[in-house]
Amino acid sequence: MERRSALPQDFREVLHCLKMRSKYAVLLVFVVGLVIIEKENNFISRVSDKLKQSPQVLPEANETEASPVQAENGSLASLRQLDTAFSQLRTRLRNVTLQLAGELGIAAPEPRRHVLLMATTRTGSSFVGEFFNQQGNIFYLFEPLWHIERTVTFEPGGANAVGSALVYRDVLQQLLLCDLYILESFISPAPEEHLTAALFRRGSSHSLCEEPVCTPSLKKVFEKYHCKNRRCGPLNITLAAEACRRKQHMALKTVRIRQLEFLQPLAEDPRLDLRIIQLVRDPRAVLVSRMVAFSGKYESWKKWAAEGEAPLQEDEVQRLRGNCESIRLSAELGLRQPRWLRGRYMLVRYEDVARAPLRKALEMYRFAGIHPTPQVEEWIRANTQAPQDSNGIYSTQKNSSEQFEKWRFSIPFKLAQVVQDACEPAMRLFGYKLASSAQELTNRSLSLLEEGPPTRIT
């Protein structure tokens, strides 16, 4: 036992000798610590064997021989003392090692985070998703649930809507765990030997277009969603899954998860450290953007706005109202801070990102518990001051400070009124002001944004 009490002092002397200004010092400390712990383990093991062989409670001179129960209790008590001493030594080793690492300026490794960017179409999610795609230690996936939507058919509303949400959730859970093989059941044509040339928007993920996932390209193999900056062969899903596990963090962007409550099993999964960022945008701006991007689906809206003769179909308005209500209910759930969402939910307005992209990106990284690299800041500066002609409907390059209010000059006031009537509860929750006239709608000096706390973290 004298050896045990003297050991920490000896260990501090060893550490003092090893206190060099180099990152290798920490490694040496761990090695020394492991050696000491192993020796202590052997020492405890030998003492334990002796304790089991002979009783440790000695009889007094006027007593009879100690009973087997007394002997066993004495052995157990001594073992407990040794176990306590060993635990104290291990704790001291950990504390001194962490202290030395701090003095050397070496940050402790970040725990693995799983970031889910949850949005709806035309809310700027592709742009915001790039904040995480540009981070080298994040494995980023762009809309992988697109394949499920194309393969599994669900009618809107009722039990079918719940069924689709459950399928999306279960696939999402496996993807966050780097089980990319689950997509093979939904990709068309089906992958052969885990190879596919049909993964949706592969080129929107740096992780799928860099070595070793990017394999040599093959002649006569057409890949619709090819990598942007280099030629790669068909995606090897096995290599992609391995790359996902090697990366320190995982991030995924989707517009196909509508109800926040369905994500509770993921938030409570001990294998995941989930962070949910819900991105919202003014529904009037969303409608204008969708009428351009999905022109065929909004013919009735455009015809009514231009001619105004035939009434707008009620089911179209109900669909709009349902979308706004779904977004609002999810946000209200997140802001109520149920136990399973505490510290895991962040509400962000696209307009605030557009006005201050770097500041909002850093806030999102802080919320996720990830340290951004300089490449993220460089990308944001380079891609938020893009020239006007670079703004395609799917572009992630934007002159963001000028773009976020452009919709105000391309929507007829009567169309804005329809949106305001259908989405007023959601607009008030998110801080979007209602326009009372066409003049107010197009007056740039009048802001349609409430300036309260634009970003809310729970």
Curated annotation (Swiss-Prot):
Return the GO cellular component terms, semicolon-separated.
Golgi membrane
Instruction: Give the reaction(s) catalysed.
Output: chondroitin beta-D-glucuronate + n 3'-phosphoadenylyl sulfate = chondroitin 6'-sulfate + n adenosine 3',5'-bisphosphate + n H(+); 3'-phosphoadenylyl sulfate + keratan = adenosine 3',5'-bisphosphate + keratan 6'-sulfate
> Keywords on this record?
Carbohydrate metabolism, Glycoprotein, Golgi apparatus, Membrane, Signal-anchor, Transferase, Transmembrane, Transmembrane helix
Q: Which residues lie on this side of the membrane: Lumenal?
A: 38-458
Q: InterPro entries, per this entry?
A: Carbohydrate_sulfotransferase, Gal/GlcNAc/GalNAc_ST, P-loop_NTPase, Sulfotransferase_dom
Listed GO biological process terms:
carbohydrate metabolic process; chondroitin sulfate proteoglycan biosynthetic process; N-acetylglucosamine metabolic process
Q: Which residues are glycosylated?
A: N62, N73, N95, N236, N399, N443
Post-translational modification remark: N-glycosylated.
Q: Has the keyword Membrane been applied to this entry?
A: yes
Ranges in the Cytoplasmic compartment?
1-23
EC number in record: 2.8.2.17, 2.8.2.21
* Membrane-traversing stretches: 24-37
Q: Which GO terms describe its molecular function?
A: chondroitin 6-sulfotransferase activity; N-acetylglucosamine 6-O-sulfotransferase activity
Binding sites annotated in the UniProt record for 3'-phosphoadenylyl sulfate:
121-127, 281-289
State the family named in the UniProt similarity comment for this chain: Belongs to the sulfotransferase 1 family. Gal/GlcNAc/GalNAc subfamily.
Q: What is this protein called?
A: Carbohydrate sulfotransferase 3
